[in-house]
């Protein structure tokens, strides 16, 4: 298996060396053209009038080999990155299996192949069966094993309204789903397509750096060609092979060789977090984020609010209030609704559909912020205090004080209104995620503004915000508020990142510079976002920002190191090539007396440094959250100063080794 992987990467390396492929990397294209010219000079030295003694022919052969290895190692780094992308695609393709689906036809289940399903089909899935296609749960509930897609070993509870992904497995109960995609356009199909497309796109910064490197390369090409012309003018014959070595030493081959690999590695590293990025631009944007918009539930808190206590209003019987809560939650298939039913049941109250005859269900929406039951003469509604007061024009000092007390404990108060009066309050509790305070502190240390949007009241929002150290919060938030925050921050020339999972989040996700949609969210949210988290963990937005910073720093660090390398190589190559000018001996700081061995030593270093930097290009520079000024100082010291010192030491050691081995040309 490992041999096949090495063989595939070797073939991919050879493919990347083809001129029609490598031409997209101007620096390495020029290096490859120099290789072809070197082969020609070695084969026909008399054509260019260069020395053709045995000593020089050995030197020419060494140059040919080293230039070949330079191009080979560059192509290999890209092939290794592309190999990882292919592995991700192959792992996703393994999940596409054909299974039998139980489709409802004329009221009865009929077995068909999953490839024959169509969007809108109603399908029954039984315990321990593979879910045949993407869909929405319309009846029943059960735990679904999504480990093959998300990597999460714990089964996830799915209730009415939740989405399920084809190829995952139902491990309990029975559910009925409505297919939301045709075969070939399922979630996994789209993920495969996204991975394939993402690897081929260059980011704006990468394009800008490529243009800069191309311009630098063109300047040095003109300088080298000018030396050839000037030498002829003064009646001297320049050694073309020496000029090729000078050119390769002058141009930024190190970053030129590794730049494509860094770009592809960015997509791969995001995939390691179980996140699919639609483009490299999204990852790059993550490194420049100024404002991050966070949801409270699921991001700052654990996200599994449970009913822990019911408080009846003054004059309302306990059992009667428990019954109201159970009735209002009977058709509420959210985890919160189910927990309210369970709490009522633990207090001896059970209700059935018979008890709801004559009532119609009012589903919860993020706009209204309430749900419940109503009939011609009766209604029981539960929701946020702000929404209920606004809708039903009710007020009660005791209830409001109770809601404030619950909020100050970090809980969520759900008041219940019965026929124009507050009947009581349900208390939900959701714990703050362990470590989230430290993560937010790291975000703020990078000068990133943190804003929390929550549907909870002012007191709860203020409590949570103070607990974790947020810069700003928006209480009683509606989906439009997220969009307004995105617009406001962008008008201030700030780059914005946010998380969303609902259709009403789609406009804000599309407008944000980094929009992270949840895998269990709606199709509209996934299409609007530029990243999708397969684990549906909103906290990962912070990981994406760290990763974006790391990728930008890696590219900058390697560019700094490459250019610093070139400066050092000038002090080796130029005195060696122009040894006939004694005045240049003062810059021969390494005291390399044999010019050809000195040039060869520099070229060997130029080649092997690419190999040593491949792991850094693929893995990224270690990033610790800090201010931009501290980061700049650190990179200049390590990669700037290091880029100058390392070549001096390495080239001197290589020179001494060659001389010790008797390589004296």
UniProtKB/Swiss-Prot annotation:
Residue intervals passing through the bilayer: 28-48, 56-76, 207-227, 244-264, 570-590, 596-616, 644-664
Active-site residue list: 295
Keyword ATP-binding: yes
List of residues binding ATP: 332, 336, 364-371, 382
GO cellular component labels: plasma membrane
Keyword Transmembrane: yes
Compartment(s) of residence: Cell membrane
InterPro entries: ATPase_P-typ_cyto_dom_N, ATPase_P-typ_P_site, ATPase_P-typ_TM_dom_sf, ATPase_P-typ_transduc_dom_A_sf, HAD-like_sf, HAD_sf, P-type_ATPase_bsu_IA, P_typ_ATPase
Catalytically driven reaction(s): K(+)(out) + ATP + H2O = K(+)(in) + ADP + phosphate + H(+)
Domain of life where this protein originates: Archaea
Residue sites binding Mg(2+) per the record: 501, 505
PROSITE patterns: ATPASE_E1_E2 (PS00154)
Pfam families: E1-E2_ATPase, Hydrolase
Oligomer and partners: The system is composed of three essential subunits: KdpA, KdpB and KdpC.
Protein name: Potassium-transporting ATPase ATP-binding subunit
Organism: Thermoplasma acidophilum (strain ATCC 25905 / DSM 1728 / JCM 9062 / NBRC 15155 / AMRC-C165)
């Amino acid at each position: 298996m490992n041999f096949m992987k090495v063989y595939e990467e070797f073939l991919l390396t050879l493919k990347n060396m083809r001129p029609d492929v490598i031409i997209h990397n101007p620096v390495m294209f020029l290096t490859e053209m120099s290789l072809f010219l070197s082969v020609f000079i070695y084969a026909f030295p008399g054509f260019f009038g260069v020395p053709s003694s045995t000593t020089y022919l050995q030197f020419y052969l060494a140059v040919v080999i080293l230039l070949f290895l330079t191009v080979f190692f560059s192509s290999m780094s890209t092939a290794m990155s592309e190999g990882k992308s292919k592995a991700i695609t192959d792992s996703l393709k393994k999940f596409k299996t054909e299974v039998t689906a139980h489709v409802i036809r004329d009221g009865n289940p009929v077995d068909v192949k999953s490839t024959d399903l169509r969007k809108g089909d109603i399908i029954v899935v039984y315990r321990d069966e593979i879910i045949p296609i993407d869909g929405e749960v319309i009846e029943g509930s059960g735990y679904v094993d999504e480990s093959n897609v998300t990597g999460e070993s714990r089964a996830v509870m799915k209730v009415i309204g939740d989405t399920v992904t084809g190829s995952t497995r139902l491990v309990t109960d029975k559910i009925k789903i409505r297919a939301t995609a045709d075969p070939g356009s399922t979630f996994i199909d789209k993920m495969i397509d996204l991975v394939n497309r993402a690897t081929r796109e260059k980011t704006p910064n990468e394009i800008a750096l490529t243009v800069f490197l191309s311009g630098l390369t063109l300047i040095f090409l003109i300088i080298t060609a000018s030396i050839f012309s000037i030498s002829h003018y003064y009646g001297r014959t320049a050694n073309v092979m020496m000029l090729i070595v000078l050119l390769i030493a002058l141009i930024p081959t190190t970053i030129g060789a590794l730049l494509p690999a860094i770009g592809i590695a960015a997509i791969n590293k995001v995939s390691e977090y179980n996140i699919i990025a639609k483009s490299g631009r999204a990852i790059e944007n993550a490194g420049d984020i100024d404002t991050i918009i966070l949801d409270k539930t699921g991001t700052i808190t654990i996200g599994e609010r449970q009913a822990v206590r019911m408080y009846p209003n003054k004059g309302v019987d306990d059992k009667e209030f428990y019954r109201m809560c159970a009735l209002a939650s009977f058709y509420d298939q959210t985890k919160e609704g189910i927990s309210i039913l369970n709490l009522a049941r633990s207090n001896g109250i059970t209700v059935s559909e018979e008890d709801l005859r004559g009532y119609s269900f009012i589903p919860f929406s993020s706009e209204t912020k309430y749900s419940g039951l109503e009939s011609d003469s009766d209604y029981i509604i539960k929701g946020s205090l702000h929404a209920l007061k606004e809708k039903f024009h009710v007020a009660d000092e005791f209830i409001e004080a109770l809601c404030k007390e619950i909020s100050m404990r970090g809980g969520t108060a759900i008041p219940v209104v019965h026929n124009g009066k507050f009947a009581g309050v349900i208390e939900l509790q959701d714990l703050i995620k362990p470590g989230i305070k430290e993560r937010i502190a790291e975000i703020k240390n990078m000068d990133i503004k943190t804003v929390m949007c929550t549907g909870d009241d002012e007191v709860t929002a203020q409590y949570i915000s103070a607990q974790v150290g947020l810069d700003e919060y928006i209480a009683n938030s509606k989906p439009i508020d997220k969009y307004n925050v995105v617009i406001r921050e962008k008008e201030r020339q700030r780059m914005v990142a946010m998380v969303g999972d609902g259709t009403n989040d789609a406009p804000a996700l599309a407008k944000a510079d980094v929009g992270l949609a949840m895998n269990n969210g709606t199709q509209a949210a996934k299409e609007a976002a530029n990243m999708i988290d397969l684990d549906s963990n909103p906290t990962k937005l912070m990981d994406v920002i760290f990763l974006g910073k790391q990728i930008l720093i890696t590219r900058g660090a390697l560019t700094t190191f490459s250019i610093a390398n070139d400066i050092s190589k000038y002090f080796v190559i130029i005195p060696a090539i122009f040894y006939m000018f004694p005045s240049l001996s003062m810059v021969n700081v390494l005291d390399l007396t044999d010019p050809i061995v000195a040039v060869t030593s520099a070229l060997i270093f130029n080649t092997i440094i690419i190999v040593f930097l491949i792991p850094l290009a693929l893995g990224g520079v270690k990033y610790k959250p800090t201010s931009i000024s501290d980061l700049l100082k650190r990179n200049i010291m390590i990669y700037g100063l290091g880029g100058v010192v390392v070549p001096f030491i390495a080239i001197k050691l290589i020179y001494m080794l060659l001389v010790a081995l008797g390589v004296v040309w």
